Curated annotation (Swiss-Prot):
Protein known as: Beta-galactosidase 15
Keywords: Apoplast, Glycoprotein, Glycosidase, Hydrolase, Secreted, Signal
Active site: residue positions: 178 (proton donor), 247 (nucleophile)
Tissue: Ubiquitous, with higher levels in roots and siliques.
Glycosylation-annotated residues: 148, 248, 345, 374, 489, 495, 555
Catalytic activity: Hydrolysis of terminal non-reducing beta-D-galactose residues in beta-D-galactosides
Pfam families in alphabetical order: BetaGal_gal-bd, GHD, Glyco_hydro_35, SUEL_Lectin
Amino acid sequence: MVSLSFILCCVLVSSCAYATIVSHDGRAITIDGHRRVLLSGSIHYPRSTTEMWPDLIKKGKEGSLDAIETYVFWNAHEPTRRQYDFSGNLDLIRFLKTIQNEGMYGVLRIGPYVCAEWNYGGFPVWLHNMPGMEFRTTNTAFMNEMQNFTTMIVEMVKKEKLFASQGGPIILAQIENEYGNVIGSYGEAGKAYIQWCANMANSLDVGVPWIMCQQDDAPQPMLNTCNGYYCDNFSPNNPNTPKMWTENWTGWYKNWGGKDPHRTTEDVAFAVARFFQKEGTFQNYYMYHGGTNFDRTAGGPYITTTYDYDAPLDEFGNLNQPKYGHLKQLHDVLHAMEKTLTYGNISTVDFGNLVTATVYQTEEGSSCFIGNVNETSDAKINFQGTSYDVPAWSVSILPDCKTETYNTAKINTQTSVMVKKANEAENEPSTLKWSWRPENIDSVLLKGKGESTMRQLFDQKVVSNDESDYLWYMTTVNLKEQDPVLGKNMSLRINSTAHVLHAFVNGQHIGNYRVENGKFHYVFEQDAKFNPGANVITLLSITVGLPNYGAFFENFSAGITGPVFIIGRNGDETIVKDLSTHKWSYKTGLSGFENQLFSSESPSTWSAPLGSEPVVVDLLGLGKGTAWINGNNIGRYWPAFLSDIDGCSAEYHVPRSFLNSEGDNTLVLFEEIGGNPSLVNFQTIGVGSVCANVYEKNVLELSCNGKPISAIKFASFGNPGGDCGSFEKGTCEASNNAAAILTQECVGKEKCSIDVSEDKFGAAECGALAKRLAVEAIC
């Protein structure tokens, strides 16, 4: 008995020894009593594969992040009430342990409303279909379900001892999400709801602080935080709450038909440096890796399958240079200043014209920022006896208040130019061979046969429970020969919120309609021939992601809302027959999905591309549909929806883990509107060339991401002009041959590092101009 007690005591002491105390004061998050500068990045586990997670998280750490932040996706984990899924890339615990194994912290945003451009904001549609349900307010049914899911997630994480208070990586947890943006629409019920959220979260006793983002009135002890492109002017609602930024948008999401969003590297860096200049101490990038909206997870509506987000890591996990490298350099500088930023006394010097210097002073030393918020005018100032040139819309950082170590507008990191290459698998045929199987729709077109029947037009979510993008609405109309609506000039008029609509009368396709993004309520009308006797009307409603944002967004309709009319015209007379209360039959989905034809071995087969570079499938020539690789749903495709030459891409991510490295691979396509698959092909994506434009007294680092540098296309030290791919020599140039030096130092190597100085490249008579080394290398 004595021996057993001793063993139990040792276990308890050992467990407690590894616990981390996470708290906060008005200056910073504290870890084991020490104030910390914390830099975090969002990586959503379902938007990549389990095989990608270690590399993505490792690159986050190598980018000098401290933490990885993720949402928890309710509808992915509980697609059917009380039936849970944590398999594959939904294995939240495995993801959190991967973060832990890399020695990083975790930030767990449970929500469980997530927005995130995710289908229905992460809410399961069965929740909407519960009687009397209202989302995100003091609705008993909603609060019960939210508490059930939140508690389940917390208990799962506790069981694996993953909160910092248990020795795990999670230092912060989040309840709700951006509710402050919509709280006004809910009145007093909204205020009561957010108080309930705080009380419920606090009762779960996770042992780390809870945060609420975009919630100015977040109840204590919740920490309110900021989301946006810039949060330097944000002020917490409590003097004991540190200044925290949970979403620094590194780019933006993409809509079908839209252009690729882009946020400059310089602007992201400026926003971060400005935030820390103005007393911020926790910052998270949304996104650090965006990834892919596999299957039907994209929300919106009209959010694309790619969720690249112009993040520091691209959709495939490649370094998005120069964004990744320029931010890493910023992180290193901020970490080096951690003590002065979190403990120093703060003073500010105003130079006018939107230029300020901020000094953080401790007994050991000082660190300084010089910020120029003027968007057009560079600044030349004298600060503490030294002259500094600060470009417009930039921040210079002086860790010792003397030497400028970093400026947000001066990029010294390489730019990587990514290229796509054809599949070079051994013995791969130049074209794919295809087999075809048509979708069997006779039962719905000619018989109007469905799974359920009601005398009402229902919202698609109610009938389909979001089990499919596709819902058939069918009715049979008996017209007598003397019916006044019958005639030569007839049409079918449909009031609809379907994102895409196909209409059939008596088995004939009379037309289709695709809505413009944002204009989801419309009237479709098309000429149609009706006959005396029975006429079968079949409408196929298609959704392209359910709404994920807004007050009461659960009430945004999808499908055939009605009314539906047969219109007859006889001279100047218009006769209208309302079919809205007819007997309507409903059928969810398509037979090919139900019969799992996507797992068939009969469609096109091909060999996996050689090597380890990311793989894409180019679906140019196709219309709209869904694609599967070896039974894995890689998401919706819609190359036919091109707004202009800068619009949607026809290339879709195929994770390497979906491929068979030996033997054949199977591609299955469901093509909805028709297309030509002869152009479909597989490609790999890798670094084709790298460029750099590095200021003197910095280090040039070139890397071809595991491939050798094969040639130096351009090199000049002085004041070269142009951009990557079009560099040209300037008015002054160093005496030594820069191209020859770089050829000797770099060609044949996977990476190289060179000091940019006159000692290396020779004198350049450039006067007062800042000297730079411009390089373009071929990989």
